[in-house]
């Protein structure tokens, strides 16, 4: 009796769900997502300790100047400092990420 109920429920879900093709497409999508998540999990398991990776990334970033900020090779215009609250000398501003 239980087997007949399961078959009936499956037939009913197919008729309401839009057909076999839609169910197979959804199944393929779910299998693709599972494969993607398994790949991500393997990458996370093989990754070093996150704090070590972050420290290495931070040291690489701090070595070079910010590419979005122009470098001033001429004399400093101290008039700009009042608008941007920069330092009064030529030592520049260094922002650190904690």
From Swiss-Prot:
Mostly expressed in seedlings (especially at the hypocotyl/root junction), young cauline leaves, open flowers, and floral stems, and, to a lower extent, in roots (restricted to the stele), rosette leaves (restricted to veins), siliques, and unopened floral buds. Also present in hydathods. Residues 19-98 form the G protein gamma domain. The gene is GG1. GO terms for biological process: acropetal auxin transport; defense response to fungus; G protein-coupled receptor signaling pathway; lateral root development; protein palmitoylation; protein prenylation; seed germination. One of its GO terms (molecular function) is GTP binding. Residues 96-98 form a propeptide. Disruption phenotype: Enhanced susceptibility to Alternaria brassicicola, Plectosphaerella cucumerina and Fusarium oxysporum associated with a disturbed expression of genes involved in cell wall metabolism (e.g. lower xylose content in cell walls). Reduced induction of the plant defensin gene PDF1.2, and decreased sensitivity to methyl jasmonate (MeJA). Hypersensitive to auxin-mediated induction of lateral roots, within the central cylinder, attenuating acropetally transported auxin signaling. Enhanced sensitivity to glucose and mannitol during seed germination. Abnormal roots architecture. Residues 20-50 form a coiled coil. The keyword Coiled coil applies. Its main location: membrane. Guanine nucleotide-binding proteins (G proteins) are involved as a modulator or transducer in various transmembrane signaling systems. The beta and gamma chains are required for the GTPase activity, for replacement of GDP by GTP, and for G protein-effector interaction. Involved in the abscisic acid (ABA) and ethylene signaling pathways. Regulates acropetal transport of auxin (IAA) in roots and hypocotyls, and thus modulates root architecture (e.g. lateral root formation). The keyword Cytoplasm applies. It comes from Arabidopsis thaliana. The lineage of its organism: Eukaryota, Viridiplantae, Streptophyta, Embryophyta, Tracheophyta. Residues 88-94 are annotated as: Regulates lipidation and cell membrane subcellular localization. A lipid is attached at residue 95 (S-farnesyl cysteine). Keywords: Cell membrane, Coiled coil, Cytoplasm, Golgi apparatus, Lipoprotein, Membrane, Methylation, Palmitate, Plant defense, Prenylation, Transducer. It is found in: Cell membrane; Golgi apparatus membrane; Golgi apparatus, trans-Golgi network membrane; Cytoplasm. G proteins are composed of 3 units, alpha, beta and gamma. Interacts with the beta subunit GB1. The dimer GB1-GG1 interacts with NDL1, NDL2 and NDL3. Binds to NUDT7. This is Guanine nucleotide-binding protein subunit gamma 1. It comes from the Eukaryota. Induction: Induced locally by Alternaria brassicicola but systemically by Fusarium oxysporum.
